[in-house]
């Protein structure tokens, strides 16, 4: 048992002060058990009594861990980090020109049917260095090719979801984007979406006009359509290299790779291979045989076998590394993609990964990262002025969606005129129709917000926006829309109050307590229910009462929260009229960012 009891003594003694156990804002079950000098199974049992299911690697919040510690007769104290552990390991900033060149990192984007995958296969089959591993390949989400003695790293990510996830967490993994457009189909909506993401990333774009073997191929039409979208090819006076290709016939592949090397030379891409490694997670999964596996793109330094690394809210020691063809390697230099084993848990795509000196330093960094809410770098109308004042941003990126084309241009023009000497307003995407998941992804990637005028939002888009804390504003009066943005850049916009549903529970039985109060025996349906939360009781879809909860119990124990799938007893202040099948919504209110 985790709880400790003291035997009665014949003599009255002054109890010694309780041992103080310092914990981070988040702690794993194993770490908590080690701190208590007890078996992790006992901690798991104690959590179960509180309605929390956990395994040995589960991370729990400080308040939950505190209850376990106090039940064991100790005092819990939140460990406060005096200095950012991340800052201690940040590589020294030196002139990049002193460092050796590194391979460029390239992402291929475009419409799903325009030959993007076949183009990747053509590049891989003609140039990939497969012979090192006897032809045995392993998909790790990235691979390297070599042309004229120079390496190029390709990120083989589906769509632009991973691309967006990396940028949404502040990780810039790509140096160059290849935009693939089919010469017969021309520019499609998904092409424009990919172009928006590439522009938002601020990286050079190479145009691959694919399917040139088709009799109906019309490359000039592609160039014209892209020019109308703001991407002008070199031969028309712009900055974009356009390479005709045929993935089917493997034509134009070498020319495309040479274009990549040309851009890389102009960009002068360099990195220091002699510092502690840092990079970004580009794929991550739980391998049923080998445990947590992360594919990492090393961006600076050299990652070595045995290194202790931190990625977001997890850490580990590099037990094994594999290159893009499945060969075990002992080190990985800048721009090298590797699959590594040894993480405590699965990191998130887009997490920055960094090598540290000690396990203690790794734990401190994980603790610090756990104290920071994992949200995107998106701003909101409410906080944009503060962000500008602090020097965090110099641009306000907006995705604008309207009901009709006639509304789009005047709103767009009005917003762009609100730019000041301190902040520039960019309309990253404008279009007609509902707000889509792609719009939210672009807002995530660009650190922007979304404005809808007389238009709706798709369910998946709303769900993603809620999860990633993307600010979406809806208007049906143009002057109000423009006025709010103007006030926002001047710091005059009042914050709005929003309601957040924490969890829902259904009443399954009603009990009378000894104090003549009714207690609702409930099953938590979703989320989590909290003691002292505001609760809305719904009966037949109608609100019967809105009151604070004053009692939350599991069996005979008072608890602070109960999660979905567990039963609990709930009491509401000054309310006794519970009925079976009533729905209880637990919620809180907070200011929008």
Curated annotation (Swiss-Prot):
Segments for region (G2): 135-139
Cell location: Cytoplasm
Classification via InterPro entries: EF-G-like_DII, IF2_II, IF2_N, P-loop_NTPase, Small_GTP-bd, T_Tr_GTP-bd_dom, TF_IF2_bacterial-like, TIF_IF2
Keyword GTP-binding: yes
GO MF annotation list: GTP binding; GTPase activity; translation initiation factor activity
Main location as per UniProt: cytoplasm
SUPFAM superfamilies (alphabetical): Initiation factor IF2/eIF5b, domain 3, P-loop containing nucleoside triphosphate hydrolases, Translation proteins
Region G3, annotated ranges: 156-159
G1: annotated segments: 110-117
Residue ranges of the region described as G5: 246-248
Region (G4): 210-213
Binding sites annotated in the UniProt record for GTP: 110-117, 156-160, 210-213
UniProt keywords, alphabetically: Cytoplasm, GTP-binding, Initiation factor, Nucleotide-binding, Protein biosynthesis
Domain tr-type G, first and last residues per copy: 101-270
Recorded GO CC terms: cytosol
Family recorded in the similarity comment: Belongs to the TRAFAC class translation factor GTPase superfamily. Classic translation factor GTPase family. IF-2 subfamily.
HAMAP family assigned to the protein according to its UniProt record, in alphabetical order: IF_2_B (MF_00100_B)
Function: One of the essential components for the initiation of protein synthesis. Protects formylmethionyl-tRNA from spontaneous hydrolysis and promotes its binding to the 30S ribosomal subunits. Also involved in the hydrolysis of GTP during the formation of the 70S ribosomal complex.
Protein name: Translation initiation factor IF-2
UniProt source species: Dehalococcoides mccartyi (strain ATCC BAA-2266 / KCTC 15142 / 195)
Gene name for this UniProt entry: infB
